[in-house]
Amino acid sequence: MEFSPPLQRATLIQRYKRFLADVITPDGRELTLHCPNTGAMTGCATPGDTVWYSTSDNTKRKYPHTWELTQSQSGAFICVNTLWANRLTKEAILNESISELSGYSSLKSEVKYGAERSRIDFMLQADSRPDCYIEVKSVTLAENEQGYFPDAVTERGQKHLRELMSVAAEGQRAVIFFAVLHSAITRFSPARHIDEKYAQLLSEAQQRGVEILAYKAELSAEGMALKKSLPVTL
């Protein structure tokens, strides 16, 4: 996936009110960007980091600029726009870049399922194969090349794991897919130190037949694509 039109560069002043960020452009203009990430964004929003942003041609938007990527002072690229996790995963499935999810003839998005009436990110179907239910999570929290999810306690994420376990128990294929959107991450684990319940449920889910996949995106200011499978340690 290529950014079109190209992203523009600025330097982060501050992120505030969760949805806003002030930046300064190379020519000295101060702008307020929309921040499409409600999470903690630990390590992704340090003042002085380089920010790459897009600009909408929708004249009705109060904040036409959207924060897409952070380039940390160590040089790592991080995708902070959480919408890209699903878009990149869909693109990779359709391109058959994810070998574990290849060979299906149909892909549906936002399908209702489960006792708790969740919406699954993707459902894959093919003749003579069980339906495949895929829940996607964006991974940006990093420490010494170790990627973690979640970056805050997530009751919603816990619910999704319970739903996937129910799917697996019914004989369907259930997959939790971690889209790693941080260029410095080389391996993945659940963030037990942040949400112990989620880590416990993830281990239980694996034991009950839920598949756990982690794929890392190649990231740059020009574009992004999910390419590489990463090791997962529970």
UniProtKB/Swiss-Prot annotation:
Keywords: DNA-binding
CDD domains registered for this protein in UniProt: SfsA-like_bacterial
UniProt GO molecular function: DNA binding
InterPro entries reported in the protein's UniProt record: SfsA, SfsA_C, SfsA_N
UniProt DNA-binding residue ranges: 201-220
Keyword DNA-binding: yes
UniProt entry tagged with the keyword DNA-binding: yes
UniProt cross-references to Pfam families, sorted A to Z: SfsA, SfsA_N
Domain of life, source organism: Bacteria
Protein task: Binds to DNA non-specifically. Could be a regulatory factor involved in maltose metabolism.
Entry similarity comment: Belongs to the SfsA family.
PANTHER family per record: SUGAR FERMENTATION STIMULATION PROTEIN A (PTHR30545:SF2)
HAMAP family, sorted: SfsA
Entry protein name: Sugar fermentation stimulation protein A
Annotated organism of origin: Escherichia coli (strain SMS-3-5 / SECEC)
